Amino acid sequence: MAAKINSLAALVSLQASHHHHXSTPFYFSPFSPHLSTTLTSRRRSLRSAVVAQSTAGTQSKAPSDVDLAAVSGQDRLLKVPISNIRNFCIIAHIDHGKSTLADKLLQMTGTVQKREMKEQFLDNMDLERERGITIKLQAARMRYVFENEPYCLNLIDTPGHVDFSYEVSRSLAACEGALLVVDASQGVEAQTLANVYLALENNLEIIPVLNKIDLPGAEPVRVSQEIEEVVGLDCSDAIHCSAKEGIGITEILNAIVKRIPPPCDTAERPLRALIFDSYYDPYRGVIVYFRVIDGTIKKGDRIYFMASKKDYFADEIGVLSPNQLQADELYAGEVGYLAASIRSVADARVGDTITHYGRKAENSLPGYEEATPMVFCGLFPVDADKFPDLRDALEKLQLNDAALKFEPETSSAMGFGFRCGFLGLLHMEIIQERLEREYNLTLITTAPSVVYRVNCINGDTVECSNPSLLPEPGKRTSIEEPYVKIEMLTPKDYIGPLMELAQDRRGEFKEMKFITENRASITYELPLAEMVGDFFDQLKSRSKGYASMEYSFLGYKESELIKLDIQINGERVEPLATIVHKDKAYAVGRALTQKLKELIPRQMFKVPIQACIGAKVIASESLSAIRKDVLSKCYGGDITRKKKLLKKQAEGKKRMKAIGKVDVPQEAFMAVLKLEKEVL
């Protein structure tokens, strides 16, 4: 046994000395003496050595392409010249096969072994796999040999949904090129178009890829023409592939090497690195994902964050392959991660620039904006005792999500909760589902609203996302609401229903153009408040799922908006108040009062349910009283006895109505909130 251990130790020593004397500079290898010398690490090293020794003499068969591509962690850490680095992302609409293509690239380059492979490898959250979407940005470093030259390919995975366009902008800022993946059976979609324009603004080299060519309905020639007409890209050399079947993957890898330019060689300049993502690790603090734009960063360097003006020591740096592999040094053009015992994510904001503390860069990296929440709603725990748990859960989610904003809110009906800001409706759904799934919370959500600007008589401008905080009519001159420009791509058969939908939502028609003979692009300007309900569901329903949409924020416009209050037995119920357009006030008020009449339990007295604008009642329903038969004990006799009993009952009901309070049950609140989401 001792002899066996000695021979293994000698083998490890020989391997380590081989790497130490190699002329090519290496990052950390599994045998590096700089790695942790814990017993577990030694065992792993010995096990790796045994496997290497046992398999070295047995593989005499000709290796396949995947065998040739399969590389160990230490090979992926090999230093390559900056001219052999390629940073790229994948632009695609939802369900056009982006995550499947990313999986195949990881598999073909040997970055992920076949036994570790699972569908949507870069989509770490169960929620991402279930919904088939990418939410959080991921990155992976791949090693690819082309014409006997090793290349380092950094893939930065991006989400495709309109709500997560801020994630896309992070990715594009860290890349030189992009794969434009379009479903060969569906063609160009609206969100793809928006991301392509973002990529063109960033001067990225775009490679068109027509995916799903194995489907019976695939029309690569038609889709190529569509891309040329809509986007203006030359598709004569577009790559035809099927990520699912593995067709055309080698051509894509070769095109990345040949067509995407390498990063600029600026290693001699002062360090500037762009933070494009971060997440919180309970043991190591905030882990920062970054792209080195200028200069070099080494392990142990004292670094400085230019926006937050905080400094730290880089305890650990490395690359994402896609799991973290430690490195000694990262150069200009490379993508990696950093751990520096950062306790607060506010010290390492997304979009911030990392530089050296002793040799600061003159200017931070330009053109980066912080994500702004567009949709707000209240989140309240069903169990009031869970309020601290909800706060902790939101704080943890905020560490990973730069766009999530929240502040405490109190409601007479629902107790303590938070007013939360989101990028859009999908973002709101994802956060709610993660709170319920990952933190075991049961939540009540209020109807989503947007941020209104209120111009007051004294000249102040107040931003208001909560109807209960809206200044009184006598104190304000006007209310402005956010407007968006919406572009819908649809087959020509559904133009009528979609135009009707947009006009019903106070949309202002701008233009319509035919992209191809059968597909049209319709542009409208409409209030964001009209979109935060069921607009997207209606768009899909009226077009039988064929239409897609993309929107961008335009600015604020003055509108005739009013606050609609709900009164129950003469008392206003603030959580049910909402801000609506004057023309829709009656319809919304009528729907809310009718719903409340169905849901509030009957009382011993008559209960009026009213929808009001200020002091004016615009819709009303009455909840009739429960009848108590006070005459049941009277058997004939004098009528005055009956009259006396009825008069006494009427007086009692009158007194009860004056002092009685009507409790609105939780179910009624939830049903009305659901109704508000539908009718607004």
UniProtKB/Swiss-Prot annotation:
Top-level division of the source organism's lineage: Eukaryota
Subcellular location: Plastid, Chloroplast
GO terms for cellular component: chloroplast
SUPFAM superfamilies on file: EF-G C-terminal domain-like, P-loop containing nucleoside triphosphate hydrolases, Translation proteins
Keyword Isomerase attributed: no
Pfam families assigned: EFG_C (PF00679), GTP_EFTU (PF00009), GTP_EFTU_D2 (PF03144), LepA_C (PF06421)
InterPro entries: EF-4, EFG_III/V, EFG_V-like, EFTu-like_2, G_TR_CS, GUFP, LepA_C_sf, LepA_CTD
Keywords attached to this entry: Chloroplast, GTP-binding, Hydrolase, Nucleotide-binding, Plastid, Protein biosynthesis, Transit peptide
Enzyme class: hydrolase
Record-annotated membrane-spanning stretches: none
Annotated source species: Vitis vinifera
Primary role: Promotes chloroplast protein synthesis. May act as a fidelity factor of the translation reaction, by catalyzing a one-codon backward translocation of tRNAs on improperly translocated ribosomes.
Catalytic reaction list: GTP + H2O = GDP + phosphate + H(+)
Listed name of the protein: Translation factor GUF1 homolog, chloroplastic
Residue stretches making up the tr-type G domain: 83-264
Transit peptide boundaries: 1-51
Keyword Acetylation: no
Principal subcellular localisation of the protein: plastid
Binding locations of GTP: 92-99, 157-161, 211-214
GO molecular function, one term: GTPase activity
Biological classification of the source: Eukaryota, Viridiplantae, Streptophyta, Embryophyta, Tracheophyta
GO biological process entries: positive regulation of translation; translation
